[in-house]
Amino acid sequence: MAKKSIIAKAKRKQKFAVREYNRCPLCGRPRAFIRKFGICRICFRKLASSGEVTGVTKSSW
């Protein structure tokens, strides 16, 4: 888990736009962020398997 201070720091508006980066609002993870859904891959997988993300179906072939 990310430190609370780092999460709080990322939420604030940065002095320069280049310093802003995406962070998962559920767990605070900065990497593997899926822009379309606004969460990280781990939270996405958890929510998709429980059926909480609309329009996502498990593929099978």
UniProtKB/Swiss-Prot annotation:
SUPFAM superfamilies: Glucocorticoid receptor-like (DNA-binding domain) (SSF57716). Binds 1 zinc ion per subunit. Gene3D superfamilies: 30s Ribosomal Protein S14, Chain N (4.10.830.10). GO terms for molecular function: rRNA binding; structural constituent of ribosome; zinc ion binding. Pfam families: Ribosomal_S14. Keywords: Metal-binding, Ribonucleoprotein, Ribosomal protein, RNA-binding, rRNA-binding, Zinc. It comes from the Bacteria. GO terms for biological process: translation. Its cofactor is Zn(2+). Transmembrane segments: none annotated. Belongs to the universal ribosomal protein uS14 family. Zinc-binding uS14 subfamily. HAMAP family: Ribosomal_uS14_2_B. Binds 16S rRNA, required for the assembly of 30S particles and may also be responsible for determining the conformation of the 16S rRNA at the A site. This is Small ribosomal subunit protein uS14. The gene is rpsZ.
